């Protein structure tokens, strides 16, 4: 059994009136008189009687206990962490909603009907993490991670066909689903050096984000991942293959046993302190093979192939080359990304033919910290297709993006999914106007208008418990020709509008056990938005979320 050294309390010299003779022995000759071997450093050491280090209780997460990995459950190096999370979400928004043929309101002649929407979402997560190794520094020898998730959601619209393709289902829906968001086993293969450089493999359902801001891929899905570091942790790398699982439509959880007919491969390399201290750069390669298939979502809507143009199954092979970075140069914080995608779509439905893909994306954020405040400016560009009928797809699309950029989930444009006929202009938690049916279940579309976004933002730590986020975005299409062809509507303007948002993050106990988020956002339409959605009324949304972690 391994031994550890623990400092013992020394006698109080004031209690002994006899003076000891001076110690003339050298340091090498002195025994370790103040240290004794301890066979079990986790349980044999009794905490002192004062309150700061009281002995743990199993039901209290603020005390030390073996259920959250403070003590090993077996031997000296096997730990168990149990975590429960309850997330509540409520949102009210004004969103253009297609009314369909069977409108719920008599006399509704416009294509877009009443847009008020109420969404409620309750999610319970239970996570088990069993691992062998040390609690810090050294990579774990092996790990088992299981996260089961139960979701119940409610959606209320003012129009039929919005919650289900069958108008007899009405204008509201309640649904529930149970799935696994993590079910993976990790094993360290070998060490590369005495500085904890290592190579490990993880197989199963796991979470993976391919860059700093999730511009291309961010998902929980089935995968085999080889990862590690070298050079004293100055270099980190990932090789990951994902035979994608199908998603449940309304909860967006994994279905576990249904193949998505899509293969994704990602390789990336990180270099810390590149050029200057505090700046990390990344090179990446993504491969997306979205195979030809037919699929209907849980609400009866066709999502593969998309119900637009010439409907035919088609296969997409796309290759992404990327360079990204995150860090700071002096006082200036910087995040940037640059991607080029190429490949082919053997039958694009808008073009009505095979197309060769060639599109680009660029993003840059600069910020400056002053005391408890941060001032930000950023820009985002995704190329658009200016000729939807030729044999080139020049509109940029991602695999599964979820960017926290320019306001992220607090902004109206990224928070709301704006629907059109059979497809969506933009999807929830994305700002790419891609004209695809569904970000998770639909196929990428590289014949799209693209986007130019300019942002100014402000963040403030108002108190140690309360954080404020404010953002203003100007949105503009790069090329509207694909929209004009798809909607059979000439003369669509490039200007979308101005998106402004406010967010509050409240942590009452200065930790992540309780997190309360509030967001309010609006979009003032310009000519392009009005041309598409037939309204110049300011759109709005607000949400409140609460996350409890035990």
Segments predicted by a language model, with ranges:
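N-terminal periplasmic/intermembrane-space "pro-region" immediately following the signal or transit peptide
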Residues: 3-140, 371, 375, 404
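Outer-membrane beta-barrel channel domains
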Residues: 30-38, 63-75, 98-100, 104-258, ...
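Short loop/turn motifs that connect adjacent beta-strands in outer-membrane beta-barrel proteins
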Residues: 53-82, 93-97, 131-144, 189-199, ...
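Extended hydrophobic secondary-structure segments that form protein cores and membrane-embedded regions
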Residues: 82-85, 142-151, 199-206, 282-287, ...
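Solvent-exposed loop segments that connect transmembrane elements
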Residues: 102-109, 160-163, 249-256, 292-312, ...
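Signature for the C-terminal beta-barrel architecture of outer-membrane proteins
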Residues: 195-198, 206-393, 452-454, 461-462, ...
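Exposed, low-structure sequence patches enriched in small/polar residues
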Residues: 382, 416-490, 495-502, 506, ...
């Amino acid at each position: 059994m391994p031994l550890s050294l623990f400092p013992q309390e020394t006698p109080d010299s004031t209690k002994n009136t006899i003076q000891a003779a001076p110690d003339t022995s050298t340091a090498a000759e002195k025994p370790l008189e103040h240290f004794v071997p301890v066979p079990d450093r986790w349980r044999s050491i009794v905490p002192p009687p004062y309150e700061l280090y009281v002995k743990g209780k199993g039901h209290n997460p603020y005390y030390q206990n073996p259920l959250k990995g403070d003590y090993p459950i077996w031997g000296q190096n096997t730990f168990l962490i149990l975590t429960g999370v309850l997330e509540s979400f409520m949102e009210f928004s004004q969103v253009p909603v297609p009314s369909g043929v069977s409108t719920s309101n008599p006399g509704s002649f416009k294509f877009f009907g009443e847009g008020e929407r109420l969404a409620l979402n309750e999610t319970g997560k239970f996570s088990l993490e069993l691992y062998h190794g040390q609690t810090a520094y050294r990579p774990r020898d092996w790990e088992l991670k299981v996260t089961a998730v139960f979701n119940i959601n409610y959606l209320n619209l003012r129009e039929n066909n919005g919650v289900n393709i069958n108008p007899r289902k009405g204008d509201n829906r309640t649904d529930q689903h149970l799935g696994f968001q993590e079910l993976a086993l990790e094993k360290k293969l070998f060490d590369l050096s005495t500085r904890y450089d290592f190579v490990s493999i993880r197989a199963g359902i796991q979470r993976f984000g391919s860059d700093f801001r999730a511009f291309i891929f961010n998902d929980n899905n089935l995968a085999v991942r080889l990862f590690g570091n070298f050079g004293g942790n100055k270099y980190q790398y990932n090789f990951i293959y994902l035979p994608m699982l199908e998603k449940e439509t309304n909860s967006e959880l994994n279905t576990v046993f249904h193949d998505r007919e899509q293969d994704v491969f990602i390789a990336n390399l990180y270099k810390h302190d590149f050029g200057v201290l505090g700046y990390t750069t990344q090179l990446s390669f993504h491969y997306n093979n979205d195979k030809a298939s037919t699929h209907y979502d849980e609400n009866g809507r066709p999502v593969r192939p998309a119900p637009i143009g010439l409907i035919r199954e088609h296969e997409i092979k796309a290759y992404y080359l990327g360079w990204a970075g995150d860090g700071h140069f002096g006082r200036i914080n910087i995040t940037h990304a640059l991607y080029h995608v190429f490949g082919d779509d053997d039958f694009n439905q808008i073009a009505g033919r095979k197309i060769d893909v060639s599109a680009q994306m660029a993003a840059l954020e600069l910020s400056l910290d002053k005391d408890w405040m941060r001032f930000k400016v950023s820009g985002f560009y995704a190329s658009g297709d200016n000729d939807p009928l030729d044999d080139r797809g020049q509109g940029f699309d991602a695999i599964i993006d979820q960017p926290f950029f320019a306001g992220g989930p607090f902004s109206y444009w990224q928070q709301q999914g704006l629907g059109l006929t059979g497809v969506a202009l933009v999807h929830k938690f994305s700002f790419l106007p891609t004209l695809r049916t569904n970000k998770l279940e639909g196929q990428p579309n590289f014949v799209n208008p693209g986007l130019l976004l300019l942002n100014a933002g402000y963040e403030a730590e108002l108190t140690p418990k309360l954080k404020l986020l404010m953002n203003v975005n100007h949105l503009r299409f790069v090329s509207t020709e694909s929209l004009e062809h798809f909607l059979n509507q000439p003369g669509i303007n490039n200007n979308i509008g101005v998106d402004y948002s406010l967010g509050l993050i409240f942590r009452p106990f200065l930790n992540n056990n309780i997190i309360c988020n509030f967001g309010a956002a609006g979009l003032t339409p310009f000519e392009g938005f009005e041309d598409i959605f037939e309204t110049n009324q300011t759109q709005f949304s607000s949400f409140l979320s609460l996350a409890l972690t035990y």
